[in-house]
């Protein structure tokens, strides 16, 4: 399942590792593996690793961090803290379609932001089944990520 298991920038010299809590490992597995398309790595009965678009996330049983919509971006208040990923636009579009097909409830519907400006990007916010917010941004090229 999924078309994003291969996702990795050719120039990437390192990758990040992030560990956070989920309340149900099986629900989380289904979402990260079957909806997001992340390949599962090692696991025990209390945690599971995933290849999250070329980076490692570890989901551990526990209570997720409190989240509030306190991050202002343009006219929107977005969940803080949140996990985020940057993709190229074609991959972002494909993921948005996968999420819609899975009836994912969006915190912020897929949309373009800063249109026609440096750093133009597509963005969407959603939560995993345990309530952890995730933002995925899409750019036309890697060079646009840090434009100002």
Task: List PLM regions with ranges.
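N-terminal beta-strand motif that seeds the catalytic metal site of vicinal oxygen chelate
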Residues: 5-26, 82-83, 87, 138-148
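A generic structural signal for short beta-strands and their flanking turns/coil linkers
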Residues: 14-16, 46, 55, 79-81, ...
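Vicinal oxygen chelate
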Residues: 15-23, 51, 71-148
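Core segments of cupin and vicinal oxygen chelate
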Residues: 20-64
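Short secondary-structure boundary/capping segments
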Residues: 40, 48-49, 72-75, 115-116
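A short local loop/turn or secondary-structure capping micro-motif enriched for an aromatic residue
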Residues: 58-59, 65-69, 142-145
